[in-house]
């Protein structure tokens, strides 16, 4: 089959669980700065309406206990599940979900990879941190990557780690 969801769509599907039921518009940059290091365009969290027919911004109708169960499950993935072998981030707990998706698209067919019982696999990992109060969420997708936790997991972990390392640099420089 074909991958019908983009990484941004996969990320978007989990945001209500990380933001107490609210949809948050994904953002790819923190801020825009000029040559002198001054912030020209700051980052602003933008909420999206789960029910656009009403005048206010609505939450996705998910019970709080469901949000808690999903988040605890994603924490357990990294603590003692498929993501337990990922490197830790010093001083930060993170959570996530790995995914491995068999596929047989036109590229795999041309390479004769679509063998019944041994189809090629895409690697996925969605991670966020800190686990208790998320600031950042990341999706890693590796085409024909194999096992999600082994291939895409380390990619997501490295992005999360880089975020927190850069955050420490900002703090050290008073930003």
Where are these predicted regions, by residue range?
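Active-site beta-strand/loop architecture of penicillin-binding DD-peptidases
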Residues: 1-56, 71-171
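A short, flexible N-terminal coil/short beta segment enriched in small residues
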Residues: 68
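Short, solvent-exposed mixed-charge patches
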Residues: 174-175
């Amino acid at each position: 089959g074909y991958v019908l969801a983009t990484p941004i769509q996969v990320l978007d599907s989990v945001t209500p669980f990380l933001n107490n039921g609210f949809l948050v518009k994904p953002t790819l940059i923190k801020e825009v700065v000029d040559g002198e290091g001054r912030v020209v365009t700051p980052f602003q969290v933008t909420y999206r309406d789960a029910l656009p027919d009403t005048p206010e911004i609505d939450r996705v109708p998910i019970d709080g206990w469901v949000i808690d169960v999903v988040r605890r499950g994603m924490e357990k993935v990294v603590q003692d599940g498929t993501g337990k072998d990922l490197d830790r981030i010093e001083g930060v707990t993170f959570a996530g979900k790995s995914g491995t998706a068999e596929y047989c698209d036109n590229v795999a067919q041309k390479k004769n990879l679509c063998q019944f019982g041994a189809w090629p696999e895409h690697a996925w990992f969605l991670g966020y941190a800190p686990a208790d109060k998320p600031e950042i969420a990341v999706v890693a997708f590796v085409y024909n990557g194999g096992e999600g936790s082994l291939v895409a997991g380390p990619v997501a972990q490295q992005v999360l780690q880089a975020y927190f390392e850069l955050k420490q640099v900002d703090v050290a420089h008073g930003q």
